[in-house]
Structures are given as structure tokens and as C-alpha cells.
């Protein structure tokens, strides 16, 4: 104790700084314990970015008029991307236009440089409307599993009159439906009951997955999204590989990573609305011969796909929490995420000094 009296002013200042650093480190450690890191994983187009948008709507500031205006150009571009995909598929699938005029309309739309689109001209709108009404294009749309077409194509094309209005401002649903492939890593933090939920969305395409490694530290939970409707579709990157087989293989890889041994796993079986439509005409057994349930049975199909993923889990002690979702339905996601939040908090009670 006597030695302390002999400390120089410089040494006292050094001790004070050391003590302050120690206090700050303790505070940081406590703060870190009050932050949950949720890693959103899944193959491309499984609905991860839409889920993040829903978190912003439900638990964040939502989308103001100004925010939504910022999506106008993307809505237009999504429409051209969809129509161009169908025009190309008309050639590939050798489907004829019923209306002769639509050959010219198709040429007009084909020449559009999508990434430069910022407006819709009257000629373009008329061409798109006539094409969409053509029975040939409708047949092509019905065969969309044979090529790559965004899930939002029908939503936008059937609403082209509203979207073409001069004063058009995208609605919340328009924003949720916009498709922009995620490149890189997007973080979205939001505060719930004094705990920060930090949601991390990473690109689902194969080329993006090598970037995931940086996200693997201290992950509380993995939310893995599966597109239920992709059982009969092929990959954008490889046209002879089934999308669901790829998703299933990725899920197995993720849940057996050593980094995630202590992370809870939540499975979102997404796009349940699209499965309900598709199962009526595209039979599961044609793509998964091991399916023994009845045709056109939504519940049997959902249960079969859930079991496909549960069977990838080698650790039978590890619980996989599952939910059937529709990421474009705000009320469905509000309900599901409330259950997910409770599950995550229950699993982390001690960590967060909640007991």
C-alpha cells in the first residue's frame, strides 16, 4: 500500500487507464451477451431477403413513401426481366404466339436493356399487356419449371395497369416481391425487449457462399430457408440439378459444421402458398420417387419435405425447430417470428441473465 504513495503522476494515469479499459471490457462482454446473432442461410431465391424486409416492417421503421419510391425502378426492371425470360423460353420450348402481332411486341421487349430501365413507355406497357394475354405466353408461364422465372412475375404482370400509372409508388407488397439477388453480406440489427437481434443475410447463389465463412463466429441461431415450391425446379447455375436436392445438401453441410455445434437450428419451409398452387398439377413423386403419399395433397407434401430435411440431421439429440412460412405475408411472419424469438430466448436464458 505504501508503494502506491510513491507512484509518479504518469504511473497513476497509466493505472487509471488500465482500470478504465478493464471496466470497458467487462461492459463490452455484458453488452455482447445481450446481442443475438441470427444467420439467415439457404440457397438462392429461398426468401431470405424478403424475410429481412419483413423484420424491417414488423420490428423496424418499415418503408416510408420515400423508401418505397426508391423501389420503382426495380419493379419495372423485374417486369422486363420476367417478360424477357418468357420470350426466350417461347423459342426454347417451341411455343407459338397465338396473336401474330405479339411477334413484333416480343421483339420490342427483347431489345430493352433491363439494367438501364427507369421508366415504362406507353408502347412498352401495351406490348407487355398483349404478350401476357397471349395463350402462347400463358402456356409458357405454366411450363416455368423448365426455365428460370421469378416467383413475382405473375404478381406484377397481372397488375401492370396500376404499375404503369404516372403517379405509381410501390406498395409494401410490391417492395416485398421485388427480386434483387443478394451479393455480399447484409446485416439488419433490431431491438426486441432490450436485446439486439442481429440478422445476417448472405447470398444464396453458389458464387456467394465462399463469403459465409466470415459470419460464422458466435452465431446464436441459424435460420435456414427452404423454398417448398422448388421440388420440381432446376438451379439457375446448373440446369440439370434439382433445386431442392441442392438445398438439402447445403442444409446437411451447415448443420454438421463444427462452428454451429452450439447454435440452435430453425428451419423455415417457405413459399407454402406456391406449393399449394403447384402441387395440384406438378406431382411430387415425379421428382422424389420415394414419396408415397397421395397426389395433390398439400399436407402430405409438406410433411414429406420436412422429413427430407430432418433426415439430414445426424445428431438426433439436436432439435430442429421448424415452421411453414409465406415470406410475403406480413401477418404470417409476425406470428412465426414471435414463436422463434421465444424459442431463441428460452434457449439463451442463462446467457442473458433472464433467470
UniProtKB/Swiss-Prot annotation:
Residues 34-355 form the G-alpha domain. GTP binds at residues 42-49, 176-182, 201-205, 270-273, 327. Pfam families: G-alpha. One of its GO terms (cellular component) is cytoplasm. GO terms for molecular function: G protein-coupled receptor binding; G-protein beta/gamma-subunit complex binding; GTP binding; GTPase activity; metal ion binding. Keywords: GTP-binding, Magnesium, Metal-binding, Nucleotide-binding, Transducer. Mg(2+) binds at residues 49, 182. GO terms for biological process: action potential; adenylate cyclase-modulating G protein-coupled receptor signaling pathway; phospholipase C-activating dopamine receptor signaling pathway. It comes from the Eukaryota. The keyword Chaperone does not apply. Residues 325-330 are annotated as: G5 motif. InterPro entries: Gprotein_alpha_Q, Gprotein_alpha_su, GproteinA_insert, P-loop_NTPase. Residues 197-206 are annotated as: G3 motif. Residues 174-182 are annotated as: G2 motif. Residues 266-273 are annotated as: G4 motif. Residues 37-50 are annotated as: G1 motif. Guanine nucleotide-binding proteins (G proteins) are involved as modulators or transducers in various transmembrane signaling systems. G proteins are composed of 3 units; alpha, beta and gamma. The alpha chain contains the guanine nucleotide binding site. Belongs to the G-alpha family. G(q) subfamily. This is Guanine nucleotide-binding protein subunit alpha-14. The gene is GNA14.
Amino acid at each position: 500500500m505504501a508503494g502506491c504513495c510513491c507512484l509518479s503522476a504518469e504511473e497513476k494515469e497509466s493505472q487509471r487507464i488500465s482500470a478504465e479499459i478493464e471496466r470497458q471490457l467487462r461492459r463490452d462482454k455484458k453488452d455482447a451477451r445481450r446481442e443475438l446473432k441470427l444467420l439467415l442461410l439457404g440457397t438462392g431465391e429461398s426468401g431470405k431477403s424478403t424475410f429481412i424486409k419483413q423484420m424491417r416492417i414488423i420490428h423496424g421503421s418499415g418503408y416510408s413513401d420515400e423508401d418505397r419510391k426508391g423501389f420503382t425502378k426495380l419493379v419495372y426492371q423485374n417486369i422486363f426481366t420476367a417478360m424477357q425470360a418468357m420470350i426466350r423460353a417461347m423459342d426454347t420450348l417451341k411455343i407459338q404466339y397465338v396473336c401474330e402481332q405479339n411477334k413484333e411486341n416480343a421483339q420490342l421487349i427483347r431489345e430493352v436493356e433491363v439494367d438501364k430501365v427507369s421508366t415504362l413507355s406507353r408502347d412498352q406497357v401495351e406490348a407487355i399487356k398483349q404478350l401476357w394475354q397471349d395463350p402462347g405466353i400463358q402456356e409458357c408461364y405454366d411450363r416455368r419449371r423448365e426455365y428460370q422465372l421469378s416467383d413475382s412475375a405473375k404478381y406484377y404482370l397481372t397488375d401492370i395497369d396500376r404499375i404503369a400509372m404516372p403517379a405509381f409508388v410501390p406498395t409494401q407488397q410490391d417492395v416485398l416481391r421485388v427480386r434483387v439477388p443478394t451479393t455480399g453480406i447484409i446485416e439488419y440489427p433490431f431491438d426486441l425487449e432490450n436485446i439486439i437481434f442481429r440478422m445476417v443475410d448472405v447470398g444464396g447463389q453458389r458464387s456467394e457462399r465462399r463469403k459465409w465463412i466470415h459470419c460464422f463466429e458466435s452465431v446464436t441461431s441459424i435460420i435456414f430457408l427452404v423454398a417448398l415450391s422448388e421440388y420440381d425446379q432446376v438451379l439457375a447455375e446448373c440446369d440439370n440439378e434439382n433445386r431442392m436436392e441442392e438445398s438439402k445438401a447445403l442444409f446437411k453441410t451447415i448443420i454438421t459444421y463444427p462452428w454451429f455445434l452450439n447454435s440452435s437450428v430453425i428451419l423455415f419451409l417457405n413459399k407454402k402458398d406456391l406449393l399449394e398452387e403447384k402441387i395440384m398439377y406438378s406431382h411430387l413423386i415425379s421428382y422424389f420417387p420415394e414419396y408415397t403419399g397421395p397426389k395433390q395433397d398439400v399436407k402430405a407434401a409438406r410433411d414429406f419435405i420436412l422429413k427430407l430435411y430432418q433426415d439430414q440431421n445426424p445428431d438426433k439429440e439436436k432439435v430442429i425447430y421448424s415452421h411453414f412460412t409465406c415470406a410475403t405475408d406480413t401477418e404470417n411472419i409476425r406470428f412465426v417470428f414471435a414463436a422463434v424469438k421465444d424459442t431463441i430466448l428460452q434457449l439463451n436464458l442463462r446467457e442473458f441473465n433472464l433467470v
